């Protein structure tokens, strides 16, 4: 059985046409992208000529940003329309990105069957809260990571504050996101993420929260992980 939720996929299929509209359904992701890209670059010591796997790449906003920094990017997702949008936009930008419609578990099986390809950097951003089995995603990412590679996850804490900001605020009051984009029951506490990553033999190197400024339309990072947060992991042996 594939580790996906058809209802979650349907949400993003419907929003595919607006993926690259900076004022559309994915405006918050466009606003967040410079901040998370800078974080990834800092934690990974740059991206130039590094092999990167973007898990749950959607329409390719982060994939393209990393490719523009010199990374060799593979983007995987299970949605159809967003991947087509991603391929077309990358072509228009003159970027070479390998987009594939496949789950990370299936991608791992394919890599194992063909050859043991590993990645310097793996990103899985704003995805874990949309799948039935986050641990399976984490374990597959770990298996695809080079011994000295860096793995990134971002998700949403399971707190009242997160619900108030992400669901009530962003979806219903400010209408920054379509209603129903997020399911509070699927939000993930940092302790849960750290438990799963420990099971996958990963160690957390950094964790931080990211927050939105309504006046500037920009995000900033700090140590408050009570709502949105992202973290850096490596193999425990590192």
Curated annotation (Swiss-Prot):
<dbReference type="InterPro" id="IPR029063">
    <property type="entry name" value="SAM-dependent_MTases_sf"/>
</dbReference>
<dbReference type="GO" id="GO:0032259">
    <property type="term" value="P:methylation"/>
</dbReference>
<protein>
    <recommendedName>
        <fullName>Ubiquinone biosynthesis O-methyltransferase</fullName>
        <ecNumber>2.1.1.222</ecNumber>
        <ecNumber>2.1.1.64</ecNumber>
    </recommendedName>
</protein>
<dbReference type="InterPro" id="IPR010233">
    <property type="entry name" value="UbiG_MeTrfase"/>
</dbReference>
<keyword id="KW-0808">Transferase</keyword>
<dbReference type="GO" id="GO:0061542">
    <property type="term" value="F:3-demethylubiquinol 3-O-methyltransferase activity"/>
</dbReference>
<feature type="binding site">
    <location>
        <position position="125"/>
    </location>
    <ligand>
        <name>S-adenosyl-L-methionine</name>
    </ligand>
</feature>
<keyword id="KW-0949">S-adenosyl-L-methionine</keyword>
<feature type="binding site">
    <location>
        <position position="36"/>
    </location>
    <ligand>
        <name>S-adenosyl-L-methionine</name>
    </ligand>
</feature>
<dbReference type="Pfam" id="PF13489">
    <property type="entry name" value="Methyltransf_23"/>
</dbReference>
<feature type="binding site">
    <location>
        <position position="56"/>
    </location>
    <ligand>
        <name>S-adenosyl-L-methionine</name>
    </ligand>
</feature>
<feature type="binding site">
    <location>
        <position position="77"/>
    </location>
    <ligand>
        <name>S-adenosyl-L-methionine</name>
    </ligand>
</feature>
<keyword id="KW-0489">Methyltransferase</keyword>
<dbReference type="GO" id="GO:0010420">
    <property type="term" value="F:polyprenyldihydroxybenzoate methyltransferase activity"/>
</dbReference>
<comment type="pathway">
    <text>Cofactor biosynthesis; ubiquinone biosynthesis.</text>
</comment>
<keyword id="KW-0831">Ubiquinone biosynthesis</keyword>
<comment type="function">
    <text>O-methyltransferase that catalyzes the 2 O-methylation steps in the ubiquinone biosynthetic pathway.</text>
</comment>
<dbReference type="GO" id="GO:0102208">
    <property type="term" value="F:2-polyprenyl-6-hydroxyphenol methylase activity"/>
</dbReference>
<comment type="similarity">
    <text>Belongs to the methyltransferase superfamily. UbiG/COQ3 family.</text>
</comment>
């Amino acid at each position: 059985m594939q580790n996906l939720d058809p209802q979650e996929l349907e949400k993003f299929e419907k929003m595919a046409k607006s993926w690259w509209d900076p004022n559309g359904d994915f405006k918050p992701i466009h606003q967040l992208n410079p901040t998370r890209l800078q974080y990834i670059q800092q934690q990974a010591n740059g991206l130039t000529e590094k092999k990167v796997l973007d898990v749950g790449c959607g329409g390719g906003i982060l994939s393209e940003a990393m490719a523009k920094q010199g990374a060799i990017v593979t983007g995987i997702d299970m949605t159809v329309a967003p991947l087509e949008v991603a391929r077309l936009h990358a072509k228009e930008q003159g970027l070479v990105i390998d987009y594939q419609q496949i789950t990370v578990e299936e991608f791992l099986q394919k890599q194992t069957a063909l050859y043991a390809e590993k990645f310097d950097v793996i990103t899985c951003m704003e995805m874990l809260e949309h799948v039935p089995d986050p641990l399976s995603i984490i374990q597959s990412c770990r298996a695809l990571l080079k011994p000295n590679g860096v793995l990134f996850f971002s998700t949403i804490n399971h707190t009242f504050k997160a619900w108030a900001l992400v669901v009530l605020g962003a979806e219903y009051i400010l209408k920054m996101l379509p209603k129903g984009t997020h399911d509070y029951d699927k939000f993930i506490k940092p302790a849960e993420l750290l438990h799963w990553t420990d099971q996958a033999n990963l160690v957390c190197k950094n964790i931080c929260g990211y927050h939105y400024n309504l006046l500037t339309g920009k995000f900033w990072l700090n140590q408050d992980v009570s709502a949105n947060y992202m973290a850096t992991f490596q193999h425990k042996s590192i």
